[in-house]
């Protein structure tokens, strides 16, 4: 026992010496923290006092790890938008400044994942592995950092690629009433990017969870989730999350664009985004304007969509193509949000409920749809085979309206109606069945050259399928189409010959001679 006492004493002495040394070396640093308190809690917002120096759009920390975004700064209070469950908050709770703005994770680790607007995974997988973080709000690239839109972005949808072409870096609005196929067009465009080396982002704003789950399942089944990021702010999410969702998704897209990649982003939809911002503004007691929207609603959407562009080489050379979706009411295109977005974007694709009810899918109203930029990017082969298609279709629709009155029609008018019905039938396309550019060019050339004129209407889908399969027989012409080269008359003749041969089994009885005459005349 006596032998152990010195060792115990020695241990205690060493311990106290270590503590004394630590105390001598300890030099406390004072840290100033700006602390306020909650004065009022509303639906998704809070009013905070005691923070006179807070900056606009600064993040504030609430109890329980809840974050909020400072949007309003009055003399005595700060209006804050909350980003999570706020039911545990009460008046008097402590609020701290963070000194930073809201940012989101970006990088390849997000591809194939389903996340919320702040980057938290919603698919039950591992936490997102990210390379860096970018602010949600970023200024749009200046004019001198941009390039003209010169490369096409193929959607795989015949009526769009032929009549309303979209270029990489363009902003093309998709609008229409409820249940007219707006989301279906955007999803088909994503599916068609499978082999195009394009990163896709689908941003769901205010959608039902079941609808988003259906979209994710379709993307996964088609193999499109391998190059797609899904950003979700569900309908029951706080309005603050719905408000920042498109900005967060755009920051994720800009990371790839600045690294020289092409990106396609879909905002589904900005009508719900505008309503979420209206709700926030009314709760923050901002003065309402037209349709109760705040006065800066135009700026809210313009600063978002101006971030879509084609960058020059010093900035990375990538592109960001935006497909914003909005919902109209009773086909009213002159409402506040539709007119705002039509003026901001580079064109619009209008989906008609009347065409949808007739089963003409996609229900694109060609007369009310336009692409103000994409025409310059269209492949040369399209201009050769679909140059007059828009005019032909417009004349057909006008004549069809007059023909309903039962007047006697001359032979030329009957031929226009006959060709127009086939144009309308060929432009029909089922969902999730994109066509490649060579397939579309061969089908459209066959349409213009009269190959389909003698095919029975019921057999048109089968005849079109046969023509698409025949693309493998003309590899040299396919290469020309994909390289953007102009097709020679010899190429057109070869395409016509192939189309006539593969559609011969579908020609109506007694029309053989007429088919040959029509082809020769063309």
Swiss-Prot record:
**What reaction does this enzyme carry out catalytically?**
ATP + H2O + 4 H(+)(in) = ADP + phosphate + 5 H(+)(out)
Q: Name one GO molecular function term.
A: proton-transporting ATP synthase activity, rotational mechanism
Q: Where is this site: Required for activity?
A: 369
Q: Which UniProt keywords apply?
A: ATP synthesis, ATP-binding, Cell inner membrane, Cell membrane, CF(1), Hydrogen ion transport, Ion transport, Membrane, Nucleotide-binding, Translocase, Transport
Q: Name one Pfam family in it.
A: ATP-synt_ab_C
Its primary localisation, in coarse terms, equals membrane
What is the protein's quaternary organization? F-type ATPases have 2 components, CF(1) - the catalytic core - and CF(0) - the membrane proton channel. CF(1) has five subunits: alpha(3), beta(3), gamma(1), delta(1), epsilon(1). CF(0) has three main subunits: a(1), b(2) and c(9-12). The alpha and beta chains form an alternating ring which encloses part of the gamma chain. CF(1) is attached to CF(0) by a central stalk formed by the gamma and epsilon chains, while a peripheral stalk is formed by the delta and b chains.
Q: What EC identifiers does the entry list?
A: 7.1.2.2
Q: Give a yes or no for keyword Mitochondrion in this entry.
A: no
Q: Where does ATP bind?
A: 176-183
**Cell location:** Cell inner membrane
* UniProt-listed NCBIfam families: alt_F1F0_F1_al, atpA, PRK13343.1
Name used for this protein in its record: ATP synthase subunit alpha 2
